[in-house]
Amino acid sequence: MLRFIAGIFFGLTTLVAADSFDVCVYGGNASGVMAACAAAKEGAKVIVVEPSRWLGGMTGGGLMHIDWGREEAVSGSTRPILKKDHKDAQYRAVFAEMLQAAGVTVLFEHRVGAVEKSAGAIRAISLDLAPFDETGCPPAAPMKAGARVIAAKVFIDCSYEGDLMARAGVAYAYGREAKSTYGESLAGAQPPMSIYAIDPYVKAGDPQSGLLPGLQSTPVAPVGEADKLTMGYGFRWRFVFKGESLPIEPPANYDPKQFELYRRAFQQGVDILSGRVMRGKVDGWEKSGGRVYSGGAGNLARALFAPTNYGHNAGYADGDYATRARIWKEQQDFVRGMTHFLRTDPSVPAKQKEIALSAGLEKGAFDDTKGYPHQLYVREARRMVSDYVVTQKDMEGKAAPADSVGIASYGVDEWPYATVPLDGKVALMGGYYSMLYLEDEHRGIYRIPYRSIVPKKDQCTNLLVPVCVSASHIAMTSIRMEPVWMILGESAGVAASLAVKAGTSVQDVPYAELYPKLRALTQKVDLPKKKETKPK
């Protein structure tokens, strides 16, 4: 029977400070689990350090519908796991069973505080004990700094944020590059994806009165130029409207003034709870720049009135733990407050109020956090900058790296970046969604090279980074799908074990030795023949 005890290890070994491992995986999301199991199966002594008290990241934290891109691109040990199409709690249990079967030790609720390096390699990491709260949010400050020290021969940073990578002194970027940086036609800031005829100012028509809550004065770069914005983060909520459910409680700091945008929308007859409205024409609702999405639930999810406060995650990607804790909690409070507003405010039409009153949180998904999802959907944060940067050229089939460790196949999938005033209206800035690459001659399938998951050798010789890979922003909008990160995690785990056995740097792992091991895992690293391809 598995033992999950916050703040300590589970497994066969009780550890003391500065215990040593062959491989330390930082981040127990799906990619981290795959990396740890792959390294352990190769004979390495492995530990996973997970900042929260749950395994699986977004795969076990609310994602549910997992985007594959081309079905045949998903391979290796990842494929049979995702083929079963589990629910959140089931994925978490599957990942725990995998780690236990592989003999991997797991440390929950510890996050990296400092990194010890010498001679270009990480020698050990100091970990702070920082338990998440009862609703699944991280703390601003740790309970105990320097609570554990873990030494390892090779480290794998599978975190969504790239925290170990950054603390190890590895070069990285965040935000959007300009078109000119890598010669990418889709790069840089984009036009508004939607413009709403709602006055953005506290006092209608008066910019001096300040912006309504929920809007930002964020500077948005000219189209095609670089900025530091990241696409919106949020939670994948498990709302139910019938039967038993867990209550959605208002936040302690609830203030109805925070939802003045909603009041003004209701005054103009905008049904903010209907996907029909977001897919159709509404008086005063405009489309701009060819960036409005069409079809599917994506319209509503990427619209102004969605369970994500677009732009509010500014500062998260390269922020400290206190900044991230604030953003994480504010995103949760936003949806809790929005629900309470819809239930109680006099401005809400009867039909919308009825829907909100019937809403609850699904039982069985996140019961130990009162039904609230425990993983913020960090779609993109830092990106390593290494000797090989995956770009739009790779996606378009204009590059053919010879050291592939996995293939990706999703289109460009961005979400809005900021909610700002524009000419007296409210604009949802940026974001682009295109499945174009699935229809191109190269079928949207492209290789991810080994060089893109290892740092430059003069920066760190014993670190692999299969999540915050070396890629441009545009390439990351495609790579960022969980199956790809799982595939790259498994490849990184195998490479780490080879580096340990040979006593060499990760950059010097012979691809001639790595390739057959990946193929033995049924990992596809070569492009499939054209007749094999089909979308999923």
Model region roles, listed by residue range:
Residues 29, 88, 92, 324-332:
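Solvent-exposed, acidic/flexible segments
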Residues 3-14:
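Bacterial N-terminal signal peptides
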Residues 32:
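N-terminal Rossmann-fold NAD(P) dinucleotide-binding loop
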Residues 38, 44-45, 49-121, 152, ...:
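Conserved N-terminal/central alpha/beta ligand/cofactor-binding core
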Residues 19-29:
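Beta1/beta-strand and adjacent pyrophosphate-binding region of the FAD-binding site
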Residues 24-26, 47-50, 57-59, 65, ...:
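Structural recognition of the beta-strand scaffold that forms the well-ordered cores
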Residues 124, 129-154, 158-535:
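Flavin (FAD/FMN)-binding glycine-rich loop and adjacent Rossmann-like elements that form
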